[in-house]
Swiss-Prot record:
The keyword Repeat does not apply. It holds the Pfam family LSM. Signal peptide: none annotated. One of its GO terms (biological process) is mRNA splicing, via spliceosome. Belongs to the snRNP Sm proteins family. SmF/LSm6 subfamily. This is Probable U6 snRNA-associated Sm-like protein LSm6. Its main location: cytoplasm.
């Protein structure tokens, strides 16, 4: 019984995460990597492995803008968090 509940909770948690990402498509986000680098841009795609595609991406290190990219692909195993930002 406990295993079923845990599986159900895990499934519900995954659905909530997927719905959050779906809501963020086309919106500004901040993605922070495990190494401390932040990417700010428009979220285009997130897959089940947390691989991320962004447009109009800016790379920040220690709060300072380092580079601007048109398109950016971030590998999911490097992602620490994704934060939705207010529309500009």
């Amino acid at each position: 019984m406990t295993t079923t509940t845990t599986t159900s909770n895990t499934s519900n948690n995954s659905n909530a995460q997927f719905n959050f990402f779906k809501m963020c498509i086309g919106r500004p986000v901040v993605v922070k990597l495990n190494n401390g680098v932040e990417y700010r841009g428009i979220l285009e795609v997130v897959d089940g492995n947390m691989n991320i595609v962004m447009e109009q991406t800016e790379e920040y290190l220690n709060g300072q803008l380092k580079t601007k990219y048109g398109d950016c692909f971030l590998r999911g195993n490097n992602v620490l968090y994704i934060s939705a930002q207010p529309r500009k």
